[in-house]
Amino acid sequence: MKPLKTLALMLALALTLTACGVISSDDGPTEVVGASQPAEPQETVQPEETAPQPAGKDPIQTEPVRVGALKGPTAMGLVRMMSDDGVNSYTLAGSADELTPKLIKGELDIACVPANLAAVLYNKTEGQIVTLAVNTLGVLYIVENGGEAVQSMADLKGKTLVAAGKGSTPEFGLRYLLEQSGLDPDKDVTVDWKSEHAECVAALAAGTADLALLPQPFVTVAQGKLGNGLRVALDLTAEWDALDNGSAMITGVAVARRDFVEQNPELVDMFLKEYAVSVDWVNENTAKAAELVTANGIIESAAIAEKALPHCNIVCLTGQEMFEKLSGYLQVLAAAAPESVGGALPRDGFFYGV
């Protein structure tokens, strides 16, 4: 991509990408290269056999994959790989706009980003982004501090809530559900948008907000700070499912540069196989996984990480299953707000392995 075009693209993305918050604030991305922690005991999970290689191909990975992820559920599924892996490099960031310029410039090969942002990037790069996997299903909740006024989406009329993720899954998911409940998101509900989810937790703790839109693990973090006074008022995934619209709420995906995928198909397949093993291990070994989550700076407290992990909906869906869930979700978003997917639905080349 020519330098001027790349610069223009990065400036446009800076206006449309939003933060998917960080629990411990950092000044910039965290680089994790190789094994950041000693490997966990191997008897808990047996790695899958390496797929047979074509004649002349070396089955041992020698080229590193440069991976970026957001500090939250999208990175939590990677922690087994981050701790066992001596080849790949990992960059953790507090917001998508820290990762996407690196992906576009070729400084990252794979990035874990909000689901709708994958479609936005596909359109802005004229098809140069491929989605490899769905890595996080619905994790969004409305929480209420010190009250029980909100029992349904309709009860949000006239209310003010704090949220982060404007221009991303939190905003478009909330807007869609409000509209389906007969509310005008621009008139009936006031949203005080913050740059990070941690700011929403701080507002609840300071008493300057009573309602917040939060994803896991930030819900668990907030409950740890505020105790029993903070309750989950609405599960937005359940609200979405109740509409029976043929789709599922998707929070995060893993995407890659098309040139990287086309030049390294065996490497991509190996990465996805190891990713699936890591996700399974994280979901089955939450105590050990929580220690790695903390060691890699994703959440400060292992105890909070352990409580949050079962609610983070961490998955690794690839191929046809990825296509069915993600395409349905993007279709719903596009019908409600075309700008949420970058103006048009991606074509089939957007989905890896389909």
Label for each model-derived stretch:
Residues 28-38, 42-186, 191-193, 210-216, ...:
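Short, glycine-/small- and polar/acidic-enriched structural segments
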Residues 80-81, 140-150, 248-266, 318:
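A bilobed periplasmic-binding-protein/Venus flytrap-type ligand-binding module shared by bacterial periplasmic
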Residues 21-24:
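Bacterial signal peptide processing site
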Residues 327-354:
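Conserved C-terminal helix/tail region of periplasmic/extracytoplasmic solute-binding proteins
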